[in-house]
Amino acid sequence: MSHQTGIQASEDVKDIFARARNGKYRLLKISIENEKLVIGSCRKPSDSWDQDYDSFVLPLLEDKQPCYVLFRLDSQNAQGYEWIFIAWSPDHSHVRQKMLYAATRATLKKEFGGGHIKDEMFGTVKEDVSLHGYKKYLLSQSSPAPLTAAEEELRQIKINEVQTDVSVDAKHQTLQGVAFPISQEAFQALEKLNNRQLNYVQLEIDIKNEIIILANTINTELKDLPKRIPKDAARYHFFLYKHSHEGDYLESIVFIYSMPGYTCSIRERMLYSSCKSPLLEIVERQLQMDIIRKIEIDNGDELTADFLYEEVHPKQHAHKQSFAKPKGPSGKRGIRRIIRGPAETEATTE
C-alpha cells in the first residue's frame, strides 16, 4: 500500500490507465522500477478475450521477476470494461521483490480503479494464471473444492512468503482455530473499508456452507453503531471510527466481535470464537489493515461514544509508580553489623 512503500503511479501511467479503462488496450504489464510504477507492455485486442489470453499473458511472465498484469475481458459492468488482475510472483524471485510487490498491490488497484477489476489471481507458476488456471479459479469460486495436502502446503507457502494471497479456498486448521474461507464479496468490502471507501462492514458465518460472508455495508455513524449489533446472532464488525484526540483528527479501524450470550447455539458460539483469530490474521496480514482496537461485546448498548473513545485511547495513570523497595528475607534477621569509619577504628585500637 502507498503508505508502506510510497510507490505510486505517475501522470503518464494514469493516462494509460484511463485509455485502457475506455477499451483501447487488452493487456497492460506493470512493473516497479526505481520506486515507481511503470508500464512494461501494452497490447491491443486482436480477437476475443479467451483467444487472446494465453498468447498475450504467458510470454510476459519472467521466471525470476514479479510483475502485475491487467487483462481486459469483453464484458462490462456499470463502470465500464471488466478486468482480471494478476499478481505474478515466481518462486525463484528475490524475497525482497516479492514483499515489495505484495505491499504495492493495493496501491496499483486503487490507481487503476478497483471497480473495474472483476477477478484477481495470484501465481507462482504459469499454470496458475493460464487460461486453464483462470477457468479453474472461476470454478472454485462457484463451488469450492477441498485442497489436496500438496495444494494446501503450497497455499500456505504463498501466504507466508508473499503475504498477498487471501484465503478463498477451503477451510483449514490453524493453531488459533478454524480458518473458514472468506467470500470474494466480503473480501472486496474489507478492501474498500481499508481504502476508506466504506465506513462499516459486517460479516457473518454461513454455518451450513462453512464460509465467512458479507452481511451488510450500511453507512454507519457512531450514534448508529449500537443498532447494527444483532440481538439474536453473532457477528464480526469492522468500523471506521472517525474522531478527534488531543487536537488531531483520526480515522481508526475498530474490530468488534458481538456474541449475544446464550441466545446462540453452542455450535455457533464455538465457530465464531474459533474463526475470529484466523480471520483477523488474514485481514491484518494480507490486506495490511491496521486495526487499532479489538473489542468483544454482548450487546450493542455497550457501544457508547465514551466507551469506544476510552477503548481506543485508554486513560494513562496520572502519577508514575515509584520503585518499591525490596522486602528483606522473612523470619529472623542475622546479627546487626556496624561498619566503622577509619577514625573510629583507630580510636578503638588505641
UniProtKB/Swiss-Prot annotation:
It comes from the Eukaryota. Actin-binding protein involved in motile and morphological processes. Inhibits actin polymerization, likely by sequestering G-actin. By capping the barbed ends of filaments, it also regulates motility. Seems to play an important role in clathrin-mediated endocytosis and distribution of endocytic organelles. GO terms for molecular function: actin binding; actin filament binding; actin monomer binding. GO terms for biological process: actin filament depolymerization; barbed-end actin filament capping; positive regulation of neuron projection development; regulation of lamellipodium assembly. The modification Phosphothreonine is found at T349. Phosphorylated on serine and threonine residues. The modification N-acetylserine is found at S2. It is found in: Cytoplasm; Cytoplasm, Cytoskeleton. Belongs to the actin-binding proteins ADF family. Twinfilin subfamily. Residues 2-139, 177-313 form the ADF-H domain. This is Twinfilin-1. The lineage of its organism: Eukaryota, Metazoa, Chordata, Craniata, Vertebrata. The modification Phosphoserine is found at S143, S277. GO terms for cellular component: actin filament; cytoplasm; myofibril. The modification Phosphotyrosine is found at Y309. Interacts with G-actin; ADP-actin form and capping protein (CP). May also be able to interact with TWF2 and phosphoinositides, PI(4,5)P2. When bound to PI(4,5)P2, it is down-regulated. Interacts with ACTG1. The gene is TWF1. Residues 316-350 are annotated as: Disordered.
